[in-house]
Design a protein with these regions (language model features):
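Terminal accessory/anchoring regions of large secretory-pathway or extracellular enzymes
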Residues: 1-108
Length: 108
């Protein structure tokens, strides 16, 4: 039986995996940086956890969380098939929603 989980990065800065059957990408950034793969590139300006799914030629769904609960915005640049789009994830909420996952549909 083939394992659908592919480990793409596993170091002190970035951990990244992909479910090849579902085409879901999961990336943990322990600091600001860029994850690059031939199919996907993601750059962030702060530590965060994100998932990219439902990728097609026109859009992708991005889910992003701030486990550090910094209440600061996180800048994200997503690049797929030479198309790129930038967004700012707002993490200004406090209390039980501090750092909670945000969902964005990214138009490419």
């Amino acid at each position: 039986k083939e394992n659908a989980i592919e480990i793409l990065s596993n170091n002190a800065k970035i951990q990244a995996v992909r479910n090849t059957k579902l085409n879901v990408w999961m990336v943990t950034f322990f600091e600001a940086g860029t994850f690059k793969h031939k199919e996907l590139s993601v750059t962030v300006d702060k530590p965060c956890v994100l998932m990219v799914k439902d990728i097609n030629s026109k859009s992708a769904n991005l889910h992003i969380a701030d486990p550090g609960q910094t209440q600061s915005p996180i800048q994200v640049e997503l690049k797929i098939d030479k198309k790129k789009q930038a967004l700012t994830a707002d993490f200004s909420q406090t209390g039980i929603y501090a750092g909670a996952t945000k969902q964005y549909t990214v138009k490419l």
